[in-house]
Amino acid sequence: MEPRAAAAGEPEPPAASSSFQARLWKNLQLGVGRSKGGGGGRAGGPERRTADTPSPSPPPPVGTGNAPARGSGAGSRWSGFKKRKQVLDRVFSSSQPNLCCSSPEPLEPGGAGRAEQGSTLRRRIREHLLPAVKGPAAASGAAGGTPPGGRSPDSAPSSSSASSSLSSSPQPPPRGDRARDEGARRQGPGAHLCHQKSSSLPGTACLEQLLEPPPPPAEPARSPAESRAPETGEEHGSSQKIINTAGTSNAEVPLADPGMYQLDITLRRGQSLAARDRGGTSDPYVKFKIGGKEVFRSKIIHKNLNPVWEEKACILVDHLREPLYIKVFDYDFGLQDDFMGSAFLDLTQLELNRPTDVTLTLKDPHYPDHDLGIILLSVILTPKEGESRDVTMLMRKSWKRSSKELSENEVVGSYFSVKSLFWRTCGRPALPVLGFCRAELQNPYCKNVQFQTQSLRLSDLHRKSHLWRGIVSITLIEGRDLKAMDSNGLSDPYVKFRLGHQKYKSKIMPKTLNPQWREQFDFHLYEERGGVIDITAWDKDAGKRDDFIGRCQVDLSALSREQTHKLELQLEEGEGHLVLLVTLTASATVSISDLSVNSLEDQKEREEILKRYSPLRIFHNLKDVGFLQVKVIRAEGLMAADVTGKSDPFCVVELNNDRLLTHTVYKNLNPEWNKVFTFNIKDIHSVLEVTVYDEDRDRSADFLGKVAIPLLSIQNGEQKAYVLKNKQLTGPTKGVIYLEIDVIFNAVKASLRTLIPKEQKYIEEENRLSKQLLLRNFIRMKRCVMVLVNAAYYVNSCFDWDSPPRSLAAFVLFLFVVWNFELYMIPLVLLLLLTWNYFLIISGKDNRQRDTVVEDMLEDEEEEDDKDDKDSEKKGFINKIYAIQEVCVSVQNILDEVASFGERIKNTFNWTVPFLSWLAIVALCVFTAILYCIPLRYIVLVWGINKFTKKLRSPYAIDNNELLDFLSRVPSDVQVVQYQELKPDPSHSPYKRKKNNLG
C-alpha cells in the first residue's frame, strides 16, 4: 500500500494508478516549460511560474516504504496539480467557442487539503476538469482576477474586423509547437492569447496537436534578459507577430485538413517604400505567389513611394501549408525590374470567415537591416466546403503518428483533442466533453503500457483497408465545352478528385476544350452514408499557378450500390461539363452476395428471369438482352507480390463499362471470396473480364492475373478452373481462378442488338509505339493481301493455260455463269460456302488450323513489352519525338484495323463464332429471297430513298453500316488466341480436390 500524506488525510489511491500519477506529474512539469507566458488572467500570482522560476523537482518515486508525512511535503508533492488546475480547465474549455480562459486560483493554506480530497485518481481528475464556479474561483474574480465574461482587465475588446499587425521576415514562419513557443517569448507575460490557442499540456492543444507535426526537441531555457526583451516593446514590424485577438472569439481557426479555401485579398496601399530610381522615387507593383507560382500581379503606380492600389484578388488554395509570398518590384522599362522587398503571410494564422487587416514589413534577405517600408492588406479566408468537417477523417489523421513518437500523455491529449473538436463541431455544451474526458481517464487502457499497446492497435486498425465500407470506382471520361483560360483560346485541363484524405489527379490534356481522359480511379469508403466527392478542374500553366476552371460535387449517398451511373456534371463557378461513370461497390462488411444467396438458386426467381427473357417478350425493352451471374469462388497458387511471400488479392469483374470488386483477402495466396455478381447484358457479344490484383496501400494495385471470357462461350452452371493470363492475354501467369457463370438471354434481342453499334469501352489501355507491334500488324495485313494476290495469280494462270485441264474447266464455268448470272447468286454463293464449311466441321474434317504464327508473334511482343517496361523505368524522360510517335501509332492502328477486317471475314465463314455464322446464314437466306423476288432497280431505289431521308426522319440517328457492325462482333485472329482457354494443371481440378478430401 502507498503511504498517505499527512496533510491530505485522504484514503490511499490504488497501486495500479501510482505509476500513471508519476508520469502525469512529470508531464505537468514539462508542460510548464512549454507554456511560458501563456493564457489570460493576471500575471505574477503567488505561485505562478515564469521564465525565471525553475521547475520544481519531481516527487519521490512511490514505493512500499514510508514517506514523509508533513503537510509541507504533501503540499509540495501535489502543488503541480493545483498550479495546473485552471490550465486544464482552459484546455478542455477551449473546445467550446463561447468559453474563455479562466485565471489561475490563488493558493490558500487550505488549498492542499482540498486538492487531496478523494481516494482515487478519478476523484482528483474530476476536481481538475470540472470548472469551479464557487469558492476560490469566485474569490479570485472578486479580487481583481478575470471578470465575468472571461477577459482580463487589460484586454482590449475584440472587433469584427480583427485588425492585426502582422510583420514578417522573408523566411517562412515557424510551424507547430516551436511557433507557439516563439510567440510566447515575444509576447511576454502580459500578452493575451485567443483561447483556441492555449497549449498548457503537451498533446492537449485541441487543434494544433491534432493537425500539426510532432514538436521539435525542447529548446534550452532562456535567460531572464531574453525573457524580458519582448516587454520593452517592439518597433512596427521588427519581428514576426502571430495574429491574436483579445477576449472571446466565435471565429474558427482554419483547419490543416486538405480542402479548397478561397482567399480574398484587398491590396490597399504601401507606405515609405524604397526608392529605386534616380529621381528618388519608384514605380512599384506587387506580386503574390503561392507554392512558387505567381497568382496575382497588381498594376504599376508610377513615381510614388506611398502607392494606393485598392485592388482585389480572389485566390483558390488547396491547403494552408504554403504561405502567401508577397514581393514588391520597381518597374523599369527595357531593363530588369528592381527588387523592393518581400514578406510572408502565414495562412494558418488567419481566422475563417473574418476580415483581417494585415500590415507586412518588407525585408530584403540580403540586407535584413534596411527599412523597405510596409504593405497594408485586408484578407478574408473562406472554406469552399463549408464549416462542417469529416470527423471520421480527423480522427483517422490523429492516429497517423507512430506510437513510438508519442508519449502516453500525447496520445491522451490527441484523443481528447479529437473528441473536443467533435463536440465543438456539433455545437454541444461543455459538460458532455468533460464527461467524456472523465470516462476516458477511468478506462483501464489508460494504465501503463496497456494504453500504448491499445493505441498502437487502434492506429493499425484505422490504417487497415478492411475497415472500408465500400469502394467507389470513378471513370473520368471526358470534358465538354470547358472554359478557355489561355490567350490562344484553349486550355490544358486536368481534374482533381478528393474524398476525405484521399486525392487523385488526372493526366493533363494539352490545348483542348473537349478533353478525352478515359481514366479510372478507386476511392475507399469509410462511412455507411457514402460522403461527397469534390471535383475541381484546372488549367495547367508553366511557371505560374494553375488556373481554376470550375468545380462540382458528387453526393454518393444519392447513388445506388452495385450499379454503374453515368453522370454529366455542370461545373460551378465556371463553364462546361464533366462526364463520369461512378460505381459503388460494397466491401467485405457489406457483401455483394454470398454463395448461399443468389438469384438463380431460388426457383421462383429463376423462373421470373427466364420469363423475362422468353421468346414471347421480344419487343419488351430491346436494350435488356440478358442476365449474367458470376460466382467468384476462389483462386489458387497466386503469385506472391509482397516481400513476405504473400499477397493481398482482390478480384475485379468487368463487363463492358460495368465494374465490380470483391473484398480483399489479406496475406493469402489461395483466397476464397465466395461472392456472386449479377449483370444486365446489353450485348451478348461482350467479353467478361476477371482480373486479380494485389492490394497495396502506398501505391497502385499490382497485377496478378487476368482472364477474358466471351459470353457466348460460357457453359451454364459449370464450375470451371481458368488459368490466369498476363496483361496482354497472350500467355499464362501463375495461378488459377475458379468461376461458375450462368448466362440467360433472348436470342432475337441479341440478334437485333448485333446490327447496331457496340457499346464503347471508356477505359482502354493507351496505345504506345512498339516496333514489334508495328511488325506484327504489317505481317497480318500482308497475309490478308496475299490471299487476294494469290487469287489473282490463280486466275492469271488459267488465262495462261499453265494447266490445260484447269484452264478448260475455268473457261466453261465462266461461260455458264455469265450466261445465266442473276444478282441473287452472289449471296447464294456465300451461303453455299458457309454450308460447305459447316458440314466439314460436323463431319470431323475441320480445316481450321491453330494459328501458331500469330501466337509466336504475340509471345515476341510480350518479351518486348517487358523490355520496354524496364527501359521506361530507367528513362522516365522519354518525351522525345512525340510527333513521329503519333504518326507511327496511327499507321500501326490502321494496319491493325485492316488486318482485323480481313480476319473477321475469314472467321465468319470458318464458324469461329457459330452464333454469328448462323445469323449470317439467316441474313443471306433473306437477302437471297429478296433479290430473287424483287428486281434490282426497286432494291436500289428503296436503298437510296432510305439513305436520303434518314437524317430527315431521325436527325440525331447515328450513321452506321449494318455489315460492318456485324463484322465488328466477329473476333480477329488475335482475339481468338486471347480468348482461348488454357488447359489447367490436373492438380487444380476441383473434382480431384473433392475426391482427395473424401479419401
Curated annotation (Swiss-Prot):
Annotated C2 domain residues: 242-360, 452-569, 603-724
GO molecular function: calcium ion binding
Binding residues for Ca(2+) 4: 486, 539, 541, 547
Subcellular location(s) of the protein: Cytoplasmic vesicle, Secretory vesicle, Synaptic vesicle membrane; Recycling endosome; Endoplasmic reticulum membrane
Gene Ontology CC: endoplasmic reticulum membrane; membrane; recycling endosome; synaptic vesicle membrane
Disulfide bonds: none
Keyword Metal-binding: yes
Cited PROSITE patterns: C2
GO biological process: calcium-mediated signaling; negative regulation of cell migration; negative regulation of endocytosis; negative regulation of response to oxidative stress; regulation of neuronal synaptic plasticity; regulation of neurotransmitter secretion
Keyword entries, A-Z: Calcium, Cytoplasmic vesicle, Endoplasmic reticulum, Endosome, Membrane, Metal-binding, Repeat, Synapse, Transmembrane, Transmembrane helix
Residue spans crossing the bilayer: 811-831, 914-934
Details of cofactor binding: Binds Ca(2+) via the C2 domains in absence of phospholipids.
Residue sites binding Ca(2+) 5 per the record: 642, 648, 694, 696
Biased amino acid composition, Polar residues: 92-101
InterPro entries per the UniProt record, alphabetical: C2_dom, C2_domain_sf, MCTP_C
Binding site for Ca(2+) 3: 486, 492, 539, 541
Domain of life of the organism encoding this protein: Eukaryota
Cofactor(s) needed for function: Ca(2+)
Function in brief: Calcium sensor which is essential for the stabilization of normal baseline neurotransmitter release and for the induction and long-term maintenance of presynaptic homeostatic plasticity.
Protein's recorded name: Multiple C2 and transmembrane domain-containing protein 1
